[in-house]
């Protein structure tokens, strides 16, 4: 199921802390990283303090931890 940016913004908020379990199509360097959501872009990808790659909610595995 694809979510709209508005639906994602109701689920995920700037300032929330997440832990990445696995980013689809990437190696394991981001697995286990934690960070704070700093921005949700126009297509709903999450950007934050965990590194330079955006988290894609439909593809990547992560949990909100705070």
Segments the model singles out, each with a brief description of its role:
Residues 2-5, 13-66:
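Basic/aromatic-rich interaction segments and small domains that mediate binding to polyanionic partners
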């Amino acid at each position: 199921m694809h979510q709209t940016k508005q639906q994602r913004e109701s689920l995920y908020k700037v300032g929330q802390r997440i832990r990445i379990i696995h980013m689809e199509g990437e190696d394991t360097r981001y697995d286990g990283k934690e960070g704070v959501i700093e921005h949700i872009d126009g297509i709903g990808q999450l950007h934050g303090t965990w590194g330079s790659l955006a988290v894609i909610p439909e593809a990547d595995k992560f949990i909100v931890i705070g």
